[in-house]
Amino acid sequence: MRHVLALLASLMCVVPLAHGEDTPTPEQAIGRTLDTLHAAAAAAEGERYFALFAPDAVFIGTDATERWTLRQFRGYAEPLFARGTGWVYRPRERHVTLAALPCACIAWFDEVLDSQSYGTSRGTGVLVREDGGAWKIAQYALTFPIPNDLAPELTGRIRDFERAQDAHQTRSEGNPPPAPAQYH
């Protein structure tokens, strides 16, 4: 009888440990969400990709004009996915920070990515945890990090490009260039 009690006592200690190994930390769960996002994009699986976003999510692309609601972003990406065209971004490095809130329901991240098309890229964003425990992307921003030594030349080229675009728009419309967009 003593052996049976000892066995039961040891099982009671082991079962919680085994369960803990199966339960990911919030940071691991967020990493899995982001890994799934990149895998779905590479496989052009639109439904799986967009299911990872919160309903009011925003995607900020690399062009200064690209600030898309989820609906707008779907309008851009779904035709590509429907043709089997996705995009490949492989995480090289990732940092996840969980907000110090009692709910443990908000986190932000930054990740360095290897892009099949663009080389080194960076993704940053915010995730929120739903009532059911799933992490959803509330904001994702994609950028191209520029080495500091190249920044003066590249930002100069961007400035020249924008001036040429503004001049072309002014000539074609007969209107002055628009004022810079204000953030709300």
Which role does the model predict for each range below?
Residues 1-4:
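Positively charged n-region of N-terminal signal peptides that target proteins for export
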Residues 6-15:
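Bacterial N-terminal signal peptides
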Residues 18-20:
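Boundary at the C-terminal end of the N-terminal hydrophobic targeting segment
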Residues 22, 29, 59, 72-120, ...:
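Surface-exposed, charged secondary-structure patches
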Residues 26-45, 162-165:
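Short, aromatic-enriched amphipathic alpha-helices that serve as compact interaction elements
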Residues 43-56, 60:
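Short, well-ordered alpha-helical segments enriched in acidic and aromatic residues
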Residues 124-134:
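Short beta-strand segments and strand-loop junctions that repeat across beta-rich extracellular domains
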Residues 130-131, 138-184:
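Low-complexity, intrinsically disordered terminal/linker segments enriched in charged
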